[in-house]
Amino acid sequence: MTFQLSPELAAVVDSGLLSPVRAGTPVEAAVSDAAWLAAMVEAETALVRAQARLGTVPESAAAAIVEAARPERLDLVALARASRETANPVVGFVKALTAVVAAEDPAAAEYVHRGSTSQDILDTATMLVVRRAGVLIRADLDRCAAALERLARTHRATPMAGRTLTLHAVPTTFGLKAAGWLHLVTEARRRTAALAAALPVELGGAAGTLAGYLEHANNPGDDYADRLVEAYAHETGLAPATLPWHVLRTPIADTGAVCAFLAAALGKIAVDVQSLARTEVGEVTEPAVAGRGASSAMPHKRNPVLATLIRSAALQVPQHAAVLYGAMLAEDERSGGAWHAEWQPLRECLRLAGGAAHTAVELLTGLTVDADRMRANLDLTGGQIVSERVAAVLTPLLGKAQARALLTRASHEAADRGTSLAEVLSAAPEVTRHLTAAELEELLDPTRYLGAAPGLVDRAVGGPDRAVPHRSAA
C-alpha cells in the first residue's frame, strides 16, 4: 500500500525526525534556512551601511535599503529552488532583494550589492549564523559546567571502581570522574569563545582584490579597502579580516574543529553514563521522566536516551568536520564545488553540537548517582581491586618479583575458588609473617586506596570550598 503525504507534510523538508538530538532545540532554529536568509539580509544591509559610512553610497539610499530589506518579504522556498540555476543562493537572493527595494525606492535599488559578490555575502552571513549558534551553545556549556562542578564537589570522596579496558582496576572517586568531564566541558567552552571572538567578515569582491568596491567608490583613496573592511566589521560586529578568505577557509575549518571537539567532549560523558547505567553496574541513572526511555518491545526498560542522543551526535560531527577540512583544497581564487560542499556539513556540525550541548544540560542536571551501588561494586572482586596496594606494601619485604607473583597467584586462586583475596592471603605464610590480620584488613579496604583523587578534584574545581567562576554566554 502506498501512502500519500499531505502538501503540508511534504513541504517539511527536515523536522529532525532522523536527528532527534537536535529536534526542537534552540540551535535548530538558529541555523535554519530562515536564519541563514535573515543573516544574508543582515550582511547586505551592513555592507551598504558601511559604504554609506565612508561616503560612497548616499545615506538616503542606504536608509531605504535597510528599511525595505526584511526577510519576511522574500520567498525562502522560491530562493532555494532558484539556487539550482546558479549553484548558490545569493544570486537569486540579490535579485529578489533588489526588486523589494525597487518597489519602495527605485533609485536606492541601484546600490544593492554594489561592488560585491555572492561569496562575500554568504560567507559573512555564515559567520553571523555561527556566532548566534555559539551564544546558545556556550550558554548550555556553562550550565553543564555548573552541574558538573556540583557533582564533583558532592562526590569528591565517593569511592567507586576505576575501570581500565572495561575491567575493575583500582578504586577512584566519582568526583574525580565528574571533574574530568568538567575539564573537557570547560575546554570546549574556551574553544567556542575563542572561535566567536575571531569570526571575520568576508570582503574580497569577484576574485579577492576588492576591485569592484574600489571602482564603484570612484577612486576614494589608497586606504579605502582597509577602511571598508573595518567599517563592514563594525556594522556586523564581526572581526576585520586581514585578507579575503574566499579560498583560505580557516574560519570554516576552525568552526568544524571546535564543533568536533565539543561533541567529542560531551560524547565522552555520554559513553561513561551508558557504561555506568548498565543493569549489572547500576551506578548512575538518567533523569526519570514519564514515558522517556521506553522500549517498543520490552515494558521493563528505561533506556539511557539522553546519553544515546549525545553519543549519536559525537559520532557524526567529526565526519562532517572532515568535509570542511577537505574543502580547504579550494582551487584558484574562487572554488567551483569546494565552497559549495561546506554549507550543509557546517550546518550539521552546528546543530548536532548544539543539540548535544542542550541535551547534556538535562542529563547532567538530573543525573542520579547511586553511591551505595558504587560501594557494593567495589567488593565484586573480593578485594582484588586493591591487589596493587598489597603488592606495593609487600615489595620492600619480599622483593618486587616475588610480591607480584604472590598477588597474581592469590588473585587467581581467589577467583577460582569464589572466595575473597583476604581469605587466600591470610593463609599465605609470606603474608602472615609480615602483616597482622588487622593490617591486612586495612590494606584490602578499597575506600582507603583512593590515591590523590580527592585532591585532584579540589584542583579541578578550585579548592574544596571555593566556587569556580563560569563565564557568561556572551
UniProtKB/Swiss-Prot annotation:
This is Nitrosuccinate lyase. InterPro entries: AdenyloSucc_lyase_C (IPR019468), Fumarase/histidase_N (IPR024083), Fumarate_lyase_fam (IPR000362), Fumarate_lyase_N (IPR022761), L-Aspartase-like (IPR008948). The keyword Transcription does not apply. The lineage of its organism: Bacteria, Bacillati, Actinomycetota, Actinomycetes, Kitasatosporales. The keyword Repeat does not apply. GO terms for molecular function: lyase activity. It is an enzyme of class 4 (lyase). Fumarate binds at K301, N303. Its EC number is 4.3.99.5. CDD domains: pCLME. The active site is at S295 (proton acceptor), R334 (proton donor). Belongs to the class-II fumarase/aspartase family. It comes from the Bacteria. It catalyses: 2-nitrobutanedioate = fumarate + nitrite + H(+). It holds the Pfam family ADSL_C. It comes from Streptomyces davaonensis (strain DSM 101723 / JCM 4913 / KCC S-0913 / 768). Involved in the biosynthesis of desferrioxamine derivatives which have iron-binding properties and may act as siderophores. Catalyzes the formation of nitrous acid from nitrosuccinic acid (2-nitrobutanedioate) by elimination of its nitro group. Keywords: Lyase.
